[in-house]
Amino acid sequence: ILNAQLQSIVSLLEYVETTDDPGARAFTERMLTATRELLPRFDTGCWSLYSLNGVDASPSYHSYHVRLLRRLARLTGDPLWQETAGRWAGYQRRGGC
């Protein structure tokens, strides 16, 4: 479930920023790596998937995905998150599939 994965990473990043916990930092990096690798599988080319079982995200979850990706972009500085958020926001403006 994509929103849960993204929200978990956001929360972990905020925790690490506050505590500087090395174990949490390492775990967060592993979560980021796994999510970077899986993210293309959540992109249908015209919408986001709610989960890898192939169910399209509802409009509200698709919007939430975009917001979380933008938050990750701000927290990490990794352009992948902003690029994906921009592409998915475009899907929304065009009305999806």
Predicted features and spans:
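Well-ordered alpha-helical segments within folded domains of soluble proteins
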Residues: 1-16, 57-73
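Terminal, non-catalytic domain-edge segments
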Residues: 18, 62-97
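Long, well-ordered core segments of solenoidal/helical folds
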Residues: 22-47, 83-97
